[in-house]
Amino acid sequence: MILYPAIDLKDGNCVRLLHGEMDKATVFGTDPAAQAAKFEAAGCAWVHLVDLNGAFAGEPVNGAAVEAILARITVPAQLGGGIRDMATIERWLSKGLARVILGTVAVENPDLVREAAKAFPGQVAVGIDARNGKVATKGWATETDVLVTDLAQSFEDAGVAAIIYTDILRDGAMTGPNIEATEALGRAVTIPVIASGGVSSLPDLIALRDTGVIAGAISGRAIYDGALDLQAALAALKA
């Protein structure tokens, strides 16, 4: 299982939100590129990036910070937040991003996901953000009646590289991930599932790994707070 350290970008800074609320942002650093380089130096195989302003605006906002990160690291990076059209997808992949994450657009325009996944094999992931099993969109501000498993299964034949599943109520709360729901999703689809939201300790990571159906886990606040020792986590996942 791959550990994806998260860099959430707001106004060019590295932050974490609580429950996805922009006014509950804690700034952890003002140099995201340096933070990404630290993650690579620690041995991380990937870096997970989120353009928070972009998720709310519906278009990329923290582009300069993302480009600075891509210039600093050699490991692959994935980015979500405000990527809602083919031109933006093409632009980011041409700039060296390894994978784009499509969230809101996966609900509103699933054909775009299919088109992008076909055009860029292995480089398009679907981000499914949920509250109580229902999908939320537009930076989590809009709730839908779409069920997580239904949305995920609708992309089974689309060729998407991964599904990034975030439990909004766990995100940034340090309460542990929703292992039950994430495992159920992992069993419901053949697409690799990456867990996000609430991963706050080494036991959380081990529990996710031990399901045998979760391909990766994203953690942010726990790493910055020191609750999750990056070196120990990477070593444990290699064991």
UniProtKB/Swiss-Prot annotation:
InterPro entries: Aldolase_TIM, His_biosynth, HisA_bact_arch, Isoase_HisA-like, Isoase_HisA-like_bact, RibuloseP-bd_barrel
Keywords annotated in UniProt: Amino-acid biosynthesis, Cytoplasm, Histidine biosynthesis, Isomerase
Catalytic activity of the protein: 1-(5-phospho-beta-D-ribosyl)-5-[(5-phospho-beta-D-ribosylamino)methylideneamino]imidazole-4-carboxamide = 5-[(5-phospho-1-deoxy-D-ribulos-1-ylimino)methylamino]-1-(5-phospho-beta-D-ribosyl)imidazole-4-carboxamide
EC number: 5.3.1.16
S-S pairs: none
Example GO biological process: L-tryptophan biosynthetic process
UniProt main location, coarse: cytoplasm
Protein localization: Cytoplasm
Regions that span the bilayer: none
Catalytic residue list: 8 (proton acceptor), 129 (proton donor)
HAMAP family with a match to the protein in the record: HisA
Family membership: Belongs to the HisA/HisF family.
Protein name: 1-(5-phosphoribosyl)-5-[(5-phosphoribosylamino)methylideneamino] imidazole-4-carboxamide isomerase
